[in-house]
């Protein structure tokens, strides 16, 4: 028991924390929806607008919606919400733990491992291309520096549409960079102006202006509002080796962790190793929305 508490439990905590951090880094950069003003504490209205984004892209309206937010901005939200109506259970949690309870149809989670995004180069460039249906690459006028993977942008006048009715929304469709040079942007979702996968009201044109979210070379914590089915995380049971001093495998809360211990005759010690075989992916990135906060 003492060995487990002193050695195993701290090691597992670090391992799981690193996995969670890498997952947020990866899946957040696949999310193209964004609301709010980067660098400022998100307002309650902006959180509601993030929730509205999920509604507009047909995320289920159930109890599986969540917001992950780092501690500094969470403290600001607790202060902003303190005078508003909550039931007694949520008020006691807010007072006792200093966190926001379930409100606005979202479960609020304080998390220091959310992704912090640093915006890339120029935040406004022009298309130097004739975009076609299905394109996920755009040639642009030479920028002074390349955009960063995870940068979000809009194209002037290109509106998003309802996924089913295809009626144009009032806001411009947002896209996220998956690769970039100073003259080429690769992004998702692709440009679809017709058919079942239509996501924009019309194709952009040469010289249309592309505008990035945020200020160049500036880092912002990316709070994440999402439905749980937006992302997938999976672990698999690793094979149990034979002929070792000790081997064990445990499953807890969706994680499968293997511990192997073996005597090292050369160094006269018994090293242990912990392994988790895991993977993650944004399956429905439209069911999530980034809110770039201040973190200060």
Where are these regions (language model features)?
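Ordered hydrophobic segments in well-structured contexts
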Residues: 66-68, 152-154, 174, 271-275, ...
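Alpha-helical scaffold segments in soluble metabolic enzymes
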Residues: 10, 49, 80
